[in-house]
């Protein structure tokens, strides 16, 4: 949400969304971030709205955008091209590294094998996918939860299918069709573009091949209608969860699918990877710039490991188990009354969206209450370890337009002495700090705090009403120099 805005990507992102989606109409019929869960067939009588992330838009400075991966990659490449301190080596492979107490040496080679290079750096971050070579060479082990399900993934073109779905779900972008024979595993499909392209995945036989899978039959059955399709792509993947024991080994870090992998259920994956980068980047920058330490770097694993574990257990895995239990216990052909009663009870679509709130409340570098994870309750109150909710100031600006690139301390505008104390403490610790003194507008009052320290990733390190809190202690805690503020 706010990440593109705060990292110089906002205008590019919006331009791409506008040009590629609205003007070019590449995803004309997508209604933002809305989904539907159906029973039996998509066009059957049983369905409800599902995972509409717009329900929590008011708690963020920017609304959710469903951006196709190829456009997201375009935005990222466009931004990298603007950064003079970044080089991208296309057509090169990472082959190995060696590290010592002072630095790390990374070896790469041209795909043609003609040339090799060696880079010496302070740190290496492996973002090289679920079968990460960086993770393997670092000796970082991972735990696997094998569901032993072979999944087909296909991309198809079908104007007929699009027309059928648009008659009933023109403002919906992705669909989950439950079927009693699949024991809780999904028939999942979503729009790719306005050219009537769709992706679709579901469980198939373990020995299934491109030739044996009848994609047209499977889609016709899932939708509940007959139509023709043209297959653009077909492939297979194994449904499993994988989680690295640690996201760090010396000077090596891992992020994204290299650190954690899960079935593509619920749209959590790419956002998890972005948040890994967001969490790690400022800590690496702090270390390279001399005001971070090893304890601060260790909190990357402590914070992000807990969030993925919770996302897996409380959301993705739970959805599979809950769906399996529902399908085993209820069937409209067996008992329509009981089925419809249970189906209506399930149709509380806001619950999951409202409860998904990654946080670092248990981190050693925030003054939080509780433990870190992915379960919370969206609210405007400023709470340590949680994301800062937006607020419009009296002059009409949003607080997110004023936050610094590093730490930002937000104070009541009457707290002049505290502002001076904070600047002095930051100077002595060599911490880049922006101090904002704001008046108590209607939305600022919703924070219920007069002292808020916001981290570079827009999570709150400290929030409270205590004017006597030591600014020095708050800052040292936030960078891992001391334990929590009392």
Task: Briefly describe each language-model feature range.
Residues 1, 6, 10-338:
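Core Rossmann-like FAD-binding/catalytic domain of the broad FAD-dependent monooxygenase superfamily
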